[in-house]
């Protein structure tokens, strides 16, 4: 086993990812877009600020997961794996194109919330969330396949 020197920054990053891997962290963050849209629609800026603070602190609020079996835990591991491999998430290859398509969907949902167009808000929120779950689902499938091919990578 190799002993590596670590910095405080490395410790924070490691702690961040371990805690964020708790499925409660991921599942509670899925409510972020609907909460933002609600706050904008109702012009509730205090609630919007609260959502921002919660979203920022969320990855540190939960203890590390006991095991790696939960799907949302694997979503976080897949995201970290993707970042460590320096694979971008905003290009036109699959599944990244889903993230690219999510930008205008979420943007239009936000615009519709500002304009107080409830049907458009709801529709584009659903479209955005479907694209996001499709994207992370594809990442998890790649991560799981990589795990089966080479468990030590």
PLM-predicted stretches and their roles:
Residues 1-153:
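Short amphipathic, positively biased membrane-proximal segments
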